[in-house]
């Protein structure tokens, strides 16, 4: 009897384990929702590093907590989802764009699906140039004013990788927050030229030159915004 009891207990345990695994072993989502944050179809150049977020809500479910998605510095995002109906929206107060016109986008995910997110930025960095002349870096750009009111500051960053933003730049960040200058360039078409920077005595700069990898990026920081709008990454060496 003891042997039969042990066998029965073992079989019961196996059945419980199998049942438990069956309940927990749901299929993983396989459809990819991808796209970019854009202005008139043009991808925005952003901070990256989880600074810009999108919220995705699935319709028809009791749980209303959003799926949080981070936007890369080139404006791209992606999320792995189940097929179904979703709502996509930017996070309020997050990103270098106006709240006006912020709206929910209805998305039907069926297999791999592409959906861009159109926004109205405060400013755009246009015709960005950064040049290296020996140990001196020069930088300039044009301003495109869209929904912005005032420019808080402008700056350029240098780094040894292509991932550069206001918080990640291992060579230098050069700010200009002169109020008079910011007022002068607060108009579409204005050209701004940074004061040339001499990096003869900058050890990280000299190391970057020896390694042959130096990248730069320019940023306009709108007044009142939680972050700036950027140029594309520029390779100087």
Regions found by a protein language model. Name each.
Residues 16-20:
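C-terminal motif of bacterial Sec signal peptides marking the signal peptidase cleavage site
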Residues 31-41, 75:
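A short, amphipathic beta-strand motif
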Residues 42-62, 149-155:
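Short, ordered, surface-exposed loop/turn motifs in non-cytosolic proteins
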Residues 59-74:
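Short, acidic Ser/Thr/Gly-rich low-complexity loop/linker segments typical of extracellular
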Residues 75, 81-98:
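A short, solvent-exposed beta-strand micro-motif common in secreted/extracellular proteins
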Residues 82-85, 190, 212:
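A glycine-anchored, Pro-Gly-centered beta-turn/N-cap motif
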Residues 93-122:
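Structured interaction patches on ligand/partner-binding surfaces of diverse proteins
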Residues 196-228:
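Beta-strand-rich modules
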